[in-house]
């Protein structure tokens, strides 16, 4: 019996040492490997269901939430950054990510250029640096043209880096027909 107890203790000790060795250093707990400063993620090298780096991934994100305060980045947009970071951290090259993020509903205002955002909300648009970083990583950031009209924004107020789509409804269904997967955020 003493031999079994010693064996169990040794196995538990060895597994706890392995678990500690796999953890990143305290300063590296959160990382943003592709979209610097946004979409933080925690590396899990031994995790299940990791994406295959050889495949191409097509996702259309439906962005419907602005920040709780006008000076906060949209949590939906930040989740797009997290998704990019998760795929890149798993070894998938940016060239294998075909991502489109379309804003509508409450998220429509996140795509306004800085002067019009400031006029509407009283602060600079905190989403523009993230939109620029996403565009740089190959993500097409778009806005529902119908939502722009519903919010009584002018189309010229939309930041020049953002694609004005006919609608979120047609963008999503058109891209789904082309093999994209919908991720509502």
Each predicted region: which residue ranges?
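Acidic helix-start/capping segments at beta-turn-to-alpha-helix junctions
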Residues: 93-111
């Amino acid at each position: 019996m003493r031999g079994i107890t010693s064996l169990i203790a040794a196995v538990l000790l060895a597994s706890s040492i392995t678990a500690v060795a796999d953890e990143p250093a305290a300063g590296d707990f959160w990382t943003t490997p592709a979209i610097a400063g946004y979409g933080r993620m925690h590396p899990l090298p031994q995790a299940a269901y990791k994406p295959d780096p050889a495949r191409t991934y097509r996702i259309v994100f439906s962005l419907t939430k602005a920040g709780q305060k006008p000076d906060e980045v949209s949590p939906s947009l930040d989740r797009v950054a997290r998704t990019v970071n998760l795929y890149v951290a798993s070894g998938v090259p940016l060239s294998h990510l075909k991502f489109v993020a379309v804003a509508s509903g409450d998220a429509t205002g996140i795509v306004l250029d800085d002067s019009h955002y400031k006029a509407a909300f009283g602060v600079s648009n905190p989403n523009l640096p993230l939109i620029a970083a996403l565009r740089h990583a190959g993500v097409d950031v778009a806005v529902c043209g119908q939502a722009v009209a519903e919010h009584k924004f002018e189309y010229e107020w939309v930041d020049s880096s953002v694609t004005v789509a006919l609608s979120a409804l047609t963008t999503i269904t058109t891209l789904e027909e082309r093999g994209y997967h919908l991720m509502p955020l």
